Amino acid sequence: MNALPSSPETAWLLLVVSLPTSASTARMRFWRGIKALGATALRDGAYLLPNLPGLRAPLQTLATDAASEDGKVWMLSVQAADDQQEAEYRALFDRSTEYAEWMVELSSARSTLSDSDEAELLRVARRHGRGIDAIRKVDFFPNEASARAELQWRDFNAAIDILLSPGEPHGVAGNIPRRDPTQYQGRQWATRQHLWVDRVACAWLIRRFIDPHATFLWLEDVRQCPDDALGFDFDGATFTHIGDRVSFEVLLASFGLDEDKGLARLGQMIHVLDVGGTPVAEASGFEAVLAGARERLPNDDALLDEVGYVLDSLYTHFSSPRKR
């Protein structure tokens, strides 16, 4: 087997292979490997790949495997003769057809989402996620087709999120105006009942740092929120997700509390539990305590009272410079 050294100026990798006719198993193994890499056949036994990071080594492995089966193998570093040939090479790797077929399947699946239970929704998301991941892996030159597919995939996941978490707020674009805390004293605050991470943390923050005399209304239907109540953590609420910030983080920024080290770190924990992100060590423990308390306690008032002590302790922990 002949192999040329890597060159930073080389744009393409060409693998030429001739396997013995008797090596049917090796031939099938080689073909599967070439297909998985996303190489394109210029003709029988001649396969082209762009010389991009991460592609040379697996192509070299296929070449070595073919040579071990008494195949004749040449791995070459080549360049396009001119811009036209470069464009022709790139066109060989256009994945528009694959994306179009995947989007047709996704569109068909979306039409059935409302009739699916939670388990089926998750299965559908995983199946189509694997589909787009497989195309992404071999899409070396993303274009408008890939952008359309990514947009449709985001919309599809958003539709599933709405079905899995009815009432959950969705981030909207916009700035977070600074609020005067003196104008928010002794107010009634409202959010969805059956408190979970973001809502219970918001209620604690309101009572502890914003409005000590706040009263809370736990809504069965957010459409019944009184006009004079300050809604939080639902779509259309006064305080809800903005951009990539969850409601707790929006409250911090609104009332100038985001410079508090302990609250900022607590916000990171709430964020990862609510929408994901960089792991926070304390997150899983808080989630477990909250889940147990919600099962054990009779209502949201009792839940806020008890979990408030936990959040007090976490705030102290996050504020302390000492690490135990």
Curated annotation (Swiss-Prot):
Induction: By chromate; induction increases when cells are grown in the presence of high sulfate concentrations (3 mM SO4(2-)). It comes from Cupriavidus metallidurans (strain ATCC 43123 / DSM 2839 / NBRC 102507 / CH34) (Ralstonia metallidurans). This is Protein ChrB. It comes from the Bacteria. Together with ChrA1, this protein reduces chromate accumulation and is essential for chromate resistance, possibly as a regulatory protein. Keywords: Chromate resistance, Plasmid. One of its GO terms (biological process) is response to chromate. InterPro entries: ChrB_C (IPR018634), ChrB_N (IPR046858).
